[in-house]
Amino acid sequence: MVVYVTLRRSVKNPMKLLLHACCGPCSLEPVRLLRAAGHDLTIAYLNSNIAPADEYAHRLATLRAWAAGEQLPVIEGPYDPAAWEACAGRVGEAAHDPERRAARCRACYRLRFEEAARLAAAQGFDALGTTLSVSPYQYTDIIREELERAAAAAGVRPLFEDYRPFYDEATHRSRSLGMYRQNYCGCRFSDAEAAAERAERKAERAASREAERAAHAEERAAAEAAQAARRAERAAYDAKQAKKRAVLKALREQ
């Protein structure tokens, strides 16, 4: 039977905790909260999903630079994109198929959590947690299921918490610290999906601006037409008055 731990209960039971982390910005609030609960933390960077390799290294460097200032140990696991492709990459393209996309992410979580759980058991950690649940763009329920599954198989406790309420604060803090903030989850599929979503939003904004310009053009055309009508009306009135004055002048001169 899995002994399930939450942040609220763990205040009375501080543990030696291995915290799987995907990047620096997503670690800020989970680390703050877990330390406040009294846990002894070590970060595990196990993310073979991240592509390309330069992106993987950039995120790791950002995480390590911040963790060093926090006196927080960071363990880097093996970077094995081929293993990730065999496990999660085989699910394939899924940008417009929510079920396949969720299946791909589940396989990705499973691979990384299994690696982290084995590491936690081998190095004598009491429990395993993750920072993935800080993001509102992740599958939180699946994260919880896979974390519990991996921890149970390795004989360590799962410590899950839904950190999404702290996402805005994590965003604010990471920007204030000047941290590198990636614009996609990590894998090559998410990179393409995020790019497509950004392009779609850009197109929507452009269409909105064009519609606004068109609406303003119609308003300007209507205003100009009204002004022209007023000028024509004034010109007709002036001509009529001039004609009256000419008639009166002719009568006076008779």
Model-predicted regions and their roles:
Residues 3-254:
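Nucleotide-activated chemistry modules centered on ATP-dependent adenylation/adenylyltransferase
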